[in-house]
């Protein structure tokens, strides 16, 4: 193996890092462990400085993590059916919180509304921490959240898990159903991660890196380490990853347009 230098580049919801990798030398020594948002969501939310289809060399998909619909225990919500039926019946009463406008949990919530017809007002917070605090305190009845913060809160009985937005049940919550198995076939809202480099990387370098990524998927210990982070490991080749980008971009573009989501 070779040593790796990790260079964290926050800013503009991943846009800063995307711009840097697009302009980096295409020699295989500068790679980006990316999240899907800048490729599938950001282009629908405003102007980006990179071309999703031309600025990068895709290597593959690594893992993905869904959102969870969670309720405060004082609410009447124990199932997705409860949420949909009650919110339709009492259309001016119920809301759901998220970590912010245009993030994966907001998109999960609006996607949920579009598929089920649930009537819920979106309450954006400045981060997942304040959102979870208000859910536990009863200031907001429902929350779309990443799974990590729910674990301890659910064990303490402070929140009630309803359903997860991935197609498979979460390893952390094996008893919590997916929307898909509850009858909303194909319902999936997952923030996922992959590996890519700048456009124009030599074919032999791409092949070597792709083989290395495939070996990661064959290493049970490494896959378990990835799963332990709360991100469900699944190594996919570049062609399947690109197809996933196209499908997700089409889905989120429609959700963003229909819900009139604007960047803050």
Residues of each region from the PLM?
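Residue-level signal for nonpolar/aromatic packing positions in well-ordered secondary structure
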Residues: 6, 21, 31, 45, ...
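A structural signal for short loop-to-beta-strand junctions that line the ligand-binding cleft
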Residues: 29-31, 50-68, 94-97, 161, ...
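Flexible hinge/capping segments at coil-to-helix
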Residues: 71-92, 176, 182
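N-terminal (or domain-start) structured segment
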Residues: 1-54, 93, 116-144, 153, ...
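C-terminal lobe and pocket-closing loops
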Residues: 64, 78, 150-218, 247-250
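Ligand-binding pocket segment of bilobal, Venus flytrap-like solute-binding proteins
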Residues: 84, 92-176
């Amino acid at each position: 193996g070779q040593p790796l230098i990790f260079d964290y580049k926050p800013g503009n919801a991943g846009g800063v890092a995307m711009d840097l990798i697009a302009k980096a030398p295409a020699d295989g020594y500068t790679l980006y462990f990316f999240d899907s948002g800048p490729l599938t969501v950001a282009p629908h939310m405003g102007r980006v400085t990179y071309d999703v289809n031309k600025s990068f060399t895709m290597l593959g998909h690594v893992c993905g993590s869904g959102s969870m619909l969670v309720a405060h225990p004082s609410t009447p919500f124990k199932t997705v059916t409860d949420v949909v039926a009650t919110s339709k019946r009492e259309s001016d009463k119920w809301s759901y919180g998220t970590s912010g406008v245009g993030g994966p949990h907001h998109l999960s919530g609006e996607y949920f509304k579009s598929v089920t017809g649930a009537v819920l007002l979106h309450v954006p917070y400045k981060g997942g921490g304040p959102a979870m605090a208000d859910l536990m305190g009863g200031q907001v009845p429902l929350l779309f959240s990443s799974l990590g913060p729910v674990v301890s809160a659910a064990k303490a009985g402070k929140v009630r898990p309803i359903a997860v937005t991935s197609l498979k049940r979460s390893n952390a919550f094996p008893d919590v159903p997916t929307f898909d198995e509850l009858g909303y076939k194909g319902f999936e809202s997952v923030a996922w991660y992959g590996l890519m480099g700048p456009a124009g990387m030599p074919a032999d370098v791409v092949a070597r890196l792709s083989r290395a990524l495939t070996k990661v998927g064959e290493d049970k210990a490494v896959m378990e380490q990835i799963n332990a982070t709360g991100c469900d490991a699944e190594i996919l080749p570049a062609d399947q990853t690109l197809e996933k980008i196209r499908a997700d971009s089409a889905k989120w573009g429609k959700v963003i347009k229909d819900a009139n989501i604007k960047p803050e």
